From Swiss-Prot:
The lineage of its organism: Viruses, Duplodnaviria, Heunggongvirae, Uroviricota, Caudoviricetes. Keywords: Glycosyltransferase, Host-virus interaction, Inhibition of host innate immune response by virus, Restriction-modification system evasion by virus, Transferase, Viral immunoevasion. Its EC number is 2.4.1.27. One of its GO terms (molecular function) is DNA beta-glucosyltransferase activity. Catalyzes the transfer of glucose from uridine diphosphoglucose to 5-hydroxymethyl cytosine of T4 DNA to yield glucosyl 5-hydroxymethyl cytosine (glc-HMC). This DNA process seems to occur immediately after DNA synthesis since the DNA alpha-glucosyltransferase interacts with the clamp protein gp45. The glc-HMC modification protects the phage genome against its own nucleases and the host restriction endonuclease system. The glc-HMC modification also protects against the host CRISPR-Cas9 defense system. This is DNA beta-glucosyltransferase. The gene is bgt. It holds the Pfam family T4-Gluco-transf.
Amino acid sequence: MKIAIINMGNNVINFKTVPSSETIYLFKVISEMGLNVDIISLKNGVYTKSFDEVDVNDYDRLIVVNSSINFFGGKPNLAILSAQKFMAKYKSKIYYLFTDIRLPFSQSWPNVKNRPWAYLYTEEELLIKSPIKVISQGINLDIAKAAHKKVDNVIEFEYFPIEQYKIHMNDFQLSKPTKKTLDVIYGGSFRSGQRESKMVEFLFDTGLNIEFFGNAREKQFKNPKYPWTKAPVFTGKIPMNMVSEKNSQAIAALIIGDKNYNDNFITLRVWETMASDAVMLIDEEFDTKHRIINDARFYVNNRAELIDRVNELKHSDVLRKEMLSIQHDILNKTRAKKAEWQDAFKKAIDL
């Protein structure tokens, strides 16, 4: 049994970008199941084999990590085009890991055929005809189906908690107690403004010492419907393998979502935050059923509640340590089900 894993739109090299990191982590966790797996990308590397040097049909399974189909500046994107050519050659079912609601599977050919450089490719080279099974990180498969309604060859949908991969790796560790330099920390991107109202509500004008890391920038927050006076400190991107350590600098770390994530996707960021030395505080709308933690103290409805909860944690080390103990206990109980998670993954890819 041989498995190939690719990222549909990003070159996989190292841990400097989220898409590359995610693909490498998935490769590692699949390898740790005792399965024979290769990452295929643009070039041979420490973790990868080149698209040009392997035959996709030598593999019994092809797993694809979701990505957008964007040709920035109207120019060819070799990562996308090489990945889709690779997929188009495959003669068996393709397994699409749907970890981001914004990144459903799509064909590149409709986006290519009218470009000035379209003569470099043919429809036969790029059009993917194999049946596709979407493995959805979101539990609401109706949302996953709606995201793929325009794709004819997506024929199956199955829920699987993909995001747990990081905590099920052999070298996973909880963060150590860390000196606090921040009240609250949040990591993420602007996501085209889909979470702007939530970000402004919880992170701006709080009077707290808040850091916002990731590729969002203060100047993006300009929607007049969500006015603000004082922004958090924006500090830029960090490597994916540093997120829990970064979160640990704060007393609390915030989890928010948007309408397609609420009560649907539990994200990787949840587990990274739960593993940190920061108390995880969750927007109530993100998890109204308290699937993540069945304890109302971990949930906040608005800015005022966030401020109150953080101040409670600042003034009571007993409370802070109690809540940390609870979240770490829940994470460890989830990790104890590693064998079940591995079996469910194998079932999702029809092994």
